[in-house]
Amino acid sequence: MARSLKKGPFVDHHLAKKVESAAGSKKPIKTWSRRSMILPEMVGITIAVHNGKNHIPVLVNENMVGHKLGEFAVTRTFKGHGGDKKSSR
């Protein structure tokens, strides 16, 4: 279900402050806020998003605007389905 337009996009306050202050900085912004929406002000900034174990650097571009930060830091690793060991030559 989509968020109401009258409410506007959700961004954690601490993340919004860091984005404003790091306008021309090359250093990535560390955040645990996977639920925050990517705004046009974040384009060109590298944000290190926590995936539960470590921080994944995400370089924000125009195509990511409107999505959540957590969509770009995968939390699960797929090792592959079990199979016959003989056929894996």
Curated annotation (Swiss-Prot):
Q: Name one GO cellular component term.
A: small ribosomal subunit
What protein am I looking at? Small ribosomal subunit protein uS19
- Species: Xanthomonas oryzae pv. oryzae (strain KACC10331 / KXO85)
Gene name of the encoded protein: rpsS
Q: List the disulfide bonds.
A: none
Q: Which is an annotated GO molecular function term of this record?
A: rRNA binding
Q: Which domain of life is it from?
A: Bacteria
* Keywords assigned by UniProt, alphabetized: Ribonucleoprotein, Ribosomal protein, RNA-binding, rRNA-binding
Quote the PROSITE patterns the UniProt record gives: RIBOSOMAL_S19 (PS00323)
Give the UniProt record's GO annotations in the biological process aspect: ribosomal small subunit assembly; translation
Q: What does this protein do?
A: Protein S19 forms a complex with S13 that binds strongly to the 16S ribosomal RNA.
Q: Family per UniProt?
A: Belongs to the universal ribosomal protein uS19 family.
A Pfam family it matches: Ribosomal_S19
